[in-house]
């Protein structure tokens, strides 16, 4: 039996600013029974414990927040099960969600990923697409499985990458697009009309987490590749080189 989206009991999992447009959109469309995000981390020069952006926003909206150190703990799984969720929605949570949690909601678990899957599965699809010189990317809404970003596709939309667009610029646009597509996917799921298109796993490509070393400029590479790296590493970790000893960060480049 289908439900109106406003009657769906939804658990949201997400952590960084990228997830905020989606959380904001869902907060006005469904019953958010829990917002699950990562624990507070040391940040800034003083390394003081700071909550992630999703936790800050959720508390401002009086939404119930959970920050478990691990979703694999039995007591955490029991607490989530007690919420009787219909659906689980993930946007950039930053950790693999275990099968025990994915199996809780009867309508399944879905994820917004900022690439045209099966390309750029993994943790840094926006930065890698720019660094590779791609002129197009997009957002995929998929069903979550135990395999990284490998679930069936519900919705997918393309987005151009501007010739001077940085990772920060593109991330903001794709965050908004993710929110729009997620709302549509939730509506289709609630109505029992969500499509499922299997991914071509043979065509999958993978990208890992960014490190500071990824920003180091290799001057032996073509000029266009260096320009793309500078765009891809803005705002973090930033492209850099060394000149007479000190590290020099590079924010803009032209070929």
Cite the ranges covered by each PLM segment:
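N-terminal Rossmann-like dinucleotide-binding module
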Residues: 2-46
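Internal anion-binding site segments
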Residues: 2-3, 201-255
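Internal alpha/beta domain cores that form substrate/cofactor-binding pockets in large enzymes
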Residues: 9-11, 33-36, 64-83, 88, ...
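Amphipathic, non-transmembrane alpha-helical secondary structure
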Residues: 20, 24, 77-81, 183
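Structural motif corresponding to alpha-helix initiation and N-cap regions
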Residues: 20, 48-51, 73-77, 95, ...
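Donor/substrate-binding cores of folate-linked one-carbon enzymes
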Residues: 28, 38, 87-206
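N-terminal beta-loop-helix "entrance" segment that forms/cooperates
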Residues: 41-61
């Amino acid at each position: 039996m289908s439900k109106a989206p406003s009657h769906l009991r939804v658990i949201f999992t997400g952590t960084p600013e990228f997830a905020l447009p989606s959380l904001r959109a869902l907060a006005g469309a469904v019953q958010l029974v829990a917002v699950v995000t990562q624990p507070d981390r040391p940040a800034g020069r003083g390394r003081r414990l700071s909550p992630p952006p999703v936790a800050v926003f959720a508390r401002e909206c009086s939404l119930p927040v959970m920050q478990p150190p691990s979703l694999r703990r039995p007591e955490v799984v029991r607490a989530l099960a007690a919420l009787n969720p219909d659906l689980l929605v993930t946007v950039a949570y930053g950790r693999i969600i275990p099968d025990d949690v994915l199996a809780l909601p009867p309508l399944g678990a879905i994820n917004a990923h900022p690439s045209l899957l099966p390309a750029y599965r993994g943790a840094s699809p926006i930065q890698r697409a720019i660094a590779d010189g791609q002129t197009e990317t997009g957002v995929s809404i998929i069903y979550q499985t135990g395999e990284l970003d490998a679930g069936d596709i519900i919705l997918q939309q393309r987005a151009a990458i501007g010739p001077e667009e940085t990772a920060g610029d593109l991330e903001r646009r794709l965050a908004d697009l993710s929110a729009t597509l997620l709302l549509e996917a939730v509506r289709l799921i609630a109505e029992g009309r969500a499509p499922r298109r299997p991914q071509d796993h043979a065509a999958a490509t993978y990208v890992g987490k960014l490190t500071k070393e990824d920003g180091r400029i290799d001057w032996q590479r073509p000029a266009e590749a260096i320009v793309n790296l500078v765009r891809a590493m803005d705002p973090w970790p930033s492209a850099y080189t060394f000149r007479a000893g000190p590290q020099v960060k590079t924010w803009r480049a032209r070929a």
